[in-house]
Curated annotation (Swiss-Prot):
Designated name of the protein: Protein asunder
Regions of compositional bias (Polar residues) in chain numbering: 564-577
Regions annotated as coiled coil: 516-538
Keyword Lyase among record annotations: no
């Protein structure tokens, strides 16, 4: 009912510091021809605004935008602070206008440079008065209180924008603490009788630290920070010439606005009426003017104007042309518009053009490269509106075909199956509570392919007689008999795959597929069956069926390389208990086969239990033993008995003795070594 942006209070610092120049010089060479040497040397043709003038102009422009777009709905107040707080206007509608504010600002005037430098001159006086002003009810809040609405249901929030100049972060922190303390004290006064105004539910404090051009500030910028449950604070340091851009950026977030720049406006030159040039005009309006128009096929062209920090949507001026009623798009909404620079010549020409009863169409580009007329500017009753036109499919158009989906034309949607699913899933009111209602969502399908080409399982349900019944059993409660029947169907499917039968697809036309392609089809069918059973495995019988199918799928690809034992084990898992071969084997089974199967089962369990009891040391020792067995051990360890020391190089020196003995036997002398 009462939003935070319903109340906005500007606190302007009127101390001596704001009398200095902003250091942005404006030329005053209005005469034709070259400037004289005397004027250029003396610099008499330039002047610079003061910090106070920059703050006043930008804040008044802020409230002009608010009052243009929200006439009578949003309120803005001004408080000037020097030795005391000076109230410029009130919440009354008679003072909520530009004439009253500008006349009051003229009476306040620029701060005097001869003003004494004293601690009595402070912005804190204005902040205290701003908190008291927030506690005062507006006309709408007074009407709600008079109608009997409790005070706790009347939301009282507001925003305070303080334009000042601080030395450093410590001074700024002191300012925040004082504001928070006064805010808490004001709520205490409002809660205790006699009540002094409304309690403040929340306050948003925006501090703009203004410095002249080219001066570095010791105050750092800070995003929105929660100081207390009642107060959020953000700090911005900005040069005096750029304060208007900063407030324009802030007003977009404060009032959920958007900036649009109308480009390529043909306009005659002021000095030469025979020629024309293209100009741009920036306007502000509600953000919904763009959000309700754009569809998935459109992207907003944005740009950032020089000197600004916010994005603006660029829409191109569309040359007016004659069109019939069939060419007009339906309007989705209309929103008030106000120009950013109301005093510029392009803005004035566009406003007069619209107020004279003309309309302007605006174009925006599509993603495909073409353009579409998305907005229209027109005036009614002295107010300018932007109309959001419907450039996407509207409710008055025929419904699109389901086959015209994204990515091209799709012709194989399962339309009839989807219709059956919708009929099965329709909701009806019940007079009494159904005890089976909690189990109904579980019975709904959890797997539904949209197209026929994306599924193998549902493509075959018209050609395999048992498949529809199989799919029906998966989504309902299953008993033992249903499980046996499904096992039988899986067994028949496995037998068909073993024989090399081709799945009865429609597109094959009876042609014989290659063996590897048929095998891939069965593999895809097994995979989709497993996915379907997994999503509906709610009972023990479903889980048993899932285990059988998982075993079949894991072994199907490696079936040719399996041994006979593996094949027998595979058959024990894949065959249904009611299959003819299985029934015959069960009738002729002997005690020995039963004993063998039990022994195999016990052996497998024993291996699993032994594997589970192995420690990390056993695993490492086993790995080292297997690695050492691959190479021959040292011969000294093999030949030397346990407890004795093996002799290193036992044959060392024996070769010389053998050579001398052989020489003596043959009578040949061997000379000793030197």
């Amino acid at each position: 009912m009462f939003e935070r942006n319903q109340k906005t209070i500007f606190v302007l610092d009127h101390t001596r510091y704001f009398s200095i120049a902003s250091e942005e010089y404006i030329s005053m060479d209005f005469l034709k021809g070259k400037p004289s040497a005397h004027s250029s040397a003396g610099g008499s043709s330039q002047f610079s605004k003061s910090l106070w003038t920059c703050a006043c102009e930008s804040s008044i422009e802020y409230c002009r935008v608010v009052w243009d777009l929200f006439p009578g709905k949003k309120h803005v107040r001004f408080i000037v602070s020097d030795t005391a707080a000076h109230i410029v206007n009130t919440w009354s509608a008679s003072t909520q206008n530009m004439s009253h504010v500008m006349n009051a600002m003229v009476m306040v005037g620029v701060p005097s440079r001869s003003m004494p430098q004293s601690s009595d001159y402070s912005v804190i006086h204005g902040l205290r008065a701003a908190i008291e002003a927030l506690a005062e009810p507006t006309d709408e809040q007074s009407q709600a209180m008079a109608s009997g609405v409790p005070d706790d249901l009347i939301l009282n929030e507001g925003r305070v924008i303080c334009i000042t100049s601080a030395r450093d972060n410590t001074s700024m922190k002191s300012l925040e603490d004082i504001f928070n303390t006064v805010l808490i004290q004001q709520n205490v006064l409002s809660a205790t009788p006699p009540k002094k105004g409304l309690g403040i539910n929340h306050c948003h404090l925006v501090i703009l630290n203004i410095v002249p051009l080219g001066i570095d500030s010791m105050v750092t910028n800070r995003n929105l920070l929660e100081i207390s449950p009642l107060l959020d604070v953000e700090i911005h340091t900005v040069g005096a010439p750029d304060i208007s851009y900063k407030l324009t950026h802030l007003i977009l977030d404060h009032y959920d606005l958007a900036s649009t720049t109308v480009t390529n406006i043909p306009m005659k030159e002021e000095q030469n009426a025979n020629s024309s040039a293209n100009y741009d005009v920036e306007i502000l309006h509600s953000r919904r003017a763009h959000s309700i128009t754009c569809g998935p096929d459109f992207s907003l062209p944005t740009s950032i104007k020089q000197g600004a920090t916010y994005e603006t949507v660029t829409l191109k001026w569309c040359t007016p042309r004659g069109c019939g009623s069939a060419d007009l798009q339906p309007c989705l909404g209309q929103f008030l518009v106000t120009p950013v620079d109301v005093t510029s010549r392009p803005s004035s020409c566009l406003i007069n053009f619209l107020l004279n009863g003309r309309s302007v169409l605006l174009e925006m580009p599509r993603k495909t490269g073409s353009k579409a007329t998305s907005h229209m500017l027109s005036a009614r009753g002295g107010e300018i509106f932007i109309h959001s036109l419907c450039i996407t499919r509207s409710c008055m158009d025929e419904a699109p075909s389901i086959a015209d989906g994204p990515g091209g034309r799709v012709n194989d949607y399962r339309t009839s199956e989807l219709g059956q699913l919708m009929k099965m899933s329709r909701m009806v009111p019940l007079k009494s509570r159904d005890p089976a209602a909690p189990n109904l969502p579980r019975r709904l399908p959890r797997y539904f392919p949209l197209t026929t080409t994306s599924t193998v399982l549902f493509h075959l349900q018209r050609h395999l007689s048992w498949l529809p019944h199989f799919l029906h059993l998966l989504v309902k409660e299953m008993d033992k008999q249903d499980e046996v029947r499904c096992q039988q169907h899986i067994h028949e499917l496995y037998k068909s795959a073993s024989r090399g039968d081709v799945l009865p697809f429609t597109h094959t036309n009876g042609a014989r597929l290659k063996p590897h392609k048929a095998k891939d089809q069965y593999r895809l069918l097994y995979r989709e069956l497993e996915q379907l059973i997994q999503l509906n495995a709610s009972t023990v019988h479903h889980k048993n069926l899932l285990e059988s199918l998982q075993t079949l799928r894991a072994a199907y690809g490696d079936a040719p390389s399996k041994s006979e034992a593996g094949t027998a084990n595979l058959r024990s898992f894949t065959e249904s208990p009611l299959s003819p071969e299985r029934l015959e084997a069960m009738s002729n089974v002997s005690i020995s086969s039963s004993t063998n199967s039990n022994s195999l089962l016990k052996a497998s369990k024993r291996r699993m239990s032994n594997c589970g009891t192995r420690s990390l040391l056993d695993i490492i020792s086993s790995a080292e033993r297997s690695q050492s067995n691959k190479r021959l051990d040292f011969s000294g360890r093999i030949c030397t008995p346990i407890g004795q020391i093996a002799k290193l190089y036992p044959d060392f020196g024996n070769k010389e003795k053998d050579a001398a003995a052989a020489a003596a036997a043959s009578g040949v002398g061997v000379a000793p070594k030197e």
